[in-house]
Amino acid sequence: MKQETGRRIARWSYMAVAAGYLWWNLARMTEFSWTFTIMPYLGDFGIIAAIFSLILGWKKRSPLVWTMTAGLGWMLLMSAIRGENVLAAEWQYLKEGIIAFLVLAPLPGCLAENRFRQFLKGTIAVWTTAITCQAAIGLWAAISGHAVFSMKGTWYIGMNLGDHRLYLNAYVTTAAAKMGMTVLLTAILFALSRTKRAKIACVMAILVQCGALALTDCRTAFVALGVAAGFCVWTLLGAKVHMPSKLNHRLILPMLMAAGIILCYGLLTGLLTLIAPSVAPGPLDNVNLLEFPAHLMTEASAEQEVILDSTPVHRNIDTTDAFNGRWGIWKGAIRLLTAQPELLLTGTSAPLAAGMMNLYTTPGTKYFQHAHNLYLQTLVSWGIPGLLILLAVIAMFLVQTARISKRNQPLWVLMLSLPVIYLLVCELVDCFTMLSTGSPMLYWLCLLMGAVDAQARRMKLQRLPK
């Protein structure tokens, strides 16, 4: 009896700490922050929750949790061999990703399905409301030809009047990727909602979010959203419609993804052309955004007015520099690994990885802080073993996703994997989560990967004889 009471106390203590950890991080990052400074005590708070999650993970025997634990062990081992201080601020960024996973991934499995449904619904509703309000402000600013800055609050929404792009963040790709993720989270909220009013509100929020996303002209988010849309249709077809054979079911996936990319890219760039203002370049040009004071800018002054083509322009997907200078960064990382092959096994010190890669980049490439590719960054920082651990976690997630899609599940369950797949595609051209900085996408990724894993394990238990 006492042992059962102790387990129950530990379980509820973990859930309280994990929920607080999630809400705290989402609350401090609801704004589109261009700085993701992790507070010193946050790592200690996460470690406490991680210990709880490992204790419960042993009982639940979640392969995802234990594989990621192996990743943390490998990072600690390599850091110890190099003589690094694992409490240093630079290392904190790297361990934040794995700690967040160990804290949040077991949470859905500790809650009953109905309770997790309510927990997820409430969390997404608050997040969607905050982000939709910011998207609405951005749309108003762009369509009216104004620009709104609020750097003091570490977020910024504005319209660069020179190239007709809406900047939701000083780092446009990061902000656009967050907006695309919010579109998919709102779609899950739509599936979770039961009333017609709530569903209508979700649709309206998605329209506002897509409008703001279109004005960012971020091709990464456009393409990743198309991949997620194609995967969504494929999952629904597999769950609701009988396919002639498994081969046909698998072959149709890349076709649907290609169609989704074309559709999303066409719709969003078309929306950009439709609603983007055609105004003269204003005082925003050639301004250091990171030092700009908070204020409200009006239209370009009469002295600066020039005649422009009435049709707004956007970048073509087949431009010669399709990846905005990332080719030079990726080549630098590959040259580093070629010049020092031993790094393929051990990886380089995480704080030194960027500096070492910059030494091998193409001349003229500006300095960068990471490899702009999560998988390449993992390879450089933690070697082939670290990359294999990351790929193993992703493979386990995809297997669990496939198991869910084979059974008749509620719509919201079938859609849980969409934001994760979306983010994994975005990671091909940036480092938003895991071994990069602690952005809101990191916490959603960990929570939803754990939710898919928990749902698949529940299905497995239901099939076992009583």
Predicted regions and their residues:
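N-terminal signal-anchor transmembrane segment
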Residues: M1-G57, M75-G83
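Transmembrane alpha-helices of multi-pass inner-membrane enzymes
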Residues: A19, A229-C232, W412-K466
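Hydrophobic transmembrane alpha-helices and their immediate junctions
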Residues: L237-A239, M243, S381-I421
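A membrane-periplasm/extracellular boundary helix in multi-pass inner-membrane enzymes
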Residues: L236-I317, R335-A339
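Interfacial loop-to-transmembrane-helix boundary motif in multi-pass membrane proteins
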Residues: R11-Y14, L64-L72, L107-W140, A198, ...
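Alpha-helical transmembrane segments of multi-pass inner-membrane proteins
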Residues: K121-T154, N169-V241, M396, Q400, ...
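Aromatic-anchored transmembrane helix interface
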Residues: D44, T69-W74, V86-C110, G122, ...
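Long extracytoplasmic/lumenal interhelical loops at the membrane interface
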Residues: I317-W382
